[in-house]
Amino acid sequence: MPRYDAIVVICDNEDDHQILLRGLDEWFSEIDAFGDGVILGAARMDAREIPLPHNVVAFGDDGDRVGSFYAGDGILQLLTDAGGRIWISYFDEASYGFAKPDGTLGVSYMPGLARWDGIGSDPWFAYSDTGNQVGWCDCYAVNVGRTLVYACPYVDFPLVEIDASGVRSITPNPITRCTGLAVSNSRFDFFDHYRQNDAPVWSIRKGLREGGVVTETGREILTLPGSRSPTGWARGKIGRDGTLWLHEDGNPRQWYRYEIDS
C-alpha cells in the first residue's frame, strides 16, 4: 500500500500531546500507549516466507520508530500494561508463522493470547501454560489491568487469570458469550451484545468468584447517556481493571465508559 503520514493524539485529562508519524506502510487498526510514545498493530498480515514481515511498530514521543516485530495474523486487540509488556489477543482465523529448524516457514493456528515483555522479545503464548485445559479458538474477552490480566476464550469461556509470570488460575465459568470484561477483586462484569426485536442490546452479566467457581449474581441492560439505547454493535471493548471502554459500530470517535459497581 502507499506510504502515508498520521497524527496520534494522546489525551491525559485536559492535556493532550500530538505525535506525527511519517511513512507508515501498513493499515494499523490497533493502538495503545507505550512508554512516552505509542505502539501500533496491523490486524491482518500475510506471512508467506522467512523473514517474517513486522506488523507491530513502536514509536517514541518524537515520532521516531523505536522498534518493530512480527505478531501474527488475526489480531483482535493489542494492549500494553504498566510494566511495558505487550498483550495481543487473536480471533478464530488467526495464525502465527515461525521459522522451522531448516529455515522454512511453519505456521500454527488459533494462538489465542500472547505476551511480549518488550520490543524484540520472544512471545509467550497462554496455551503453553494451559495445555488442553483451555481451548484458545478465539479470545473473546480480555482485561489488561495494572497487575493482572483476565481472559475468557471461546468456546467454554473459562476465566483465565494471568500475571507477568504466566497463568495463575483457570476458573470454570457458567457465564458464556462475553465479549468484554470489567474486574474488581473477586467481582467480574461480563459484557455481551445481541439483537432483540431487530435492535441491538448491550448487556452485563455480573459474576462473583468464590471457592474456585464463578456464580452469576445479576443482569443489567445498558443504556447510553440520556437513557439512549445503542444503535449499533459495541466495538472497542477495552477492559482495564474495573473499567470497560466501548463505542458504537461506525462511530469510533465517541467512546463510553462502563465502571464496575464499587
What are these regions, as identified by a protein language model?
Residues 22-36, 70-83, 132-142, 173-193, ...:
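Repeated scaffold domains used in trafficking and secretory/extracellular systems
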Residues 4-12, 52-63, 102-120, 201-210:
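Beta-propeller blade signature
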Residues 15-23, 63-70, 122-133, 166-172, ...:
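A short beta-strand motif characteristic of beta-propeller blades
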Residues 1-45:
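Blade-loop segments of beta-propeller domains
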Residues 1, 41-51, 88-110:
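Short, conserved, GDST-rich strand-edge loop motifs in beta-rich repeat architectures
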Residues 38-40, 86, 149, 188-190, ...:
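Hydrophobic beta-strand positions that form the internal "hydrophobic ladder"
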Residues 43-46, 91-93, 155, 194, ...:
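Residue-level signature of beta-propeller blades and closely related beta-rich strand-turn architectures
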Residues 235-262:
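Blade-level signature of beta-propeller repeat domains, shared across WD40, Kelch, NHL, RCC1
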